[in-house]
């Protein structure tokens, strides 16, 4: 386990985590997931604990929905990290098509798809809709489908990562690692609204860029120990080793430094918003938007040190 990423934000844990944990455990157990999938999202994985850091003020139902989404991510991630060990499960094309079908049809009683994971996705979408409303669920679903489109290209794209720069890698990593989905969840759960007035705002886009960069880099940093043993080539540490010629320890240190720099970048954006005189009413909206992502960064820096997933 590498050294923890330092982050001065004073994080809080959601007081509803025990209630959400109980409901989460019941739902996961009832889905009849494959044993390997169930193992990585139950018990010591502390999935609800992660969501409790990202969404410290969410009610129990919202925290549960967010936890189920995190479970979806982890199962999806492990399926492709260890695809060569897959015991006859769905091929990538079938998997991606199934997720897309669920996102498109979850509001109707569609046919039960062949992998229990799809019922986890269906349950997650239903819970997000109940907790956040139709507009939020539709936007989240749209971003999930965009992430699936990116994942379809990831397998081919990975063959070129020995030549690409870290900047180019990160520009696409945000798509297939679902950080764009996370940004949407943050604004609806922590921000409590769509922030529609900021949709085309360049400062909002700068905030998003920093948040997703930190999310991608911190995940790569903490997960390198397990990913280097698997077939996954999507990792900033590997990119730096291949492209820049760094040894493993130097590459890890660079990724960690880039995580710290991203936090500094976000602080600078926040300070510049406060000092700008031309933003008008958008200034407070931008500050609120930025603030809704702070817990995510805290969780991304902290949770990996608390779970057995990265050990």
Swiss-Prot record:
Signal peptide: none annotated. GO terms for molecular function: metal ion binding; terpentetriene synthase activity. Its cofactor is Mg(2+). Its EC number is 4.2.3.36. Keywords: Antibiotic biosynthesis, Lyase, Magnesium, Metal-binding. Pathway: Antibiotic biosynthesis. InterPro entries: Isoprenoid_synthase_dom_sf. A motif (DDXXD motif) lies at residues 77-81. The keyword Zinc-finger does not apply. It is an enzyme of class 4 (lyase). Belongs to the terpene synthase family. This is Terpentetriene synthase. It comes from Kitasatospora griseola.
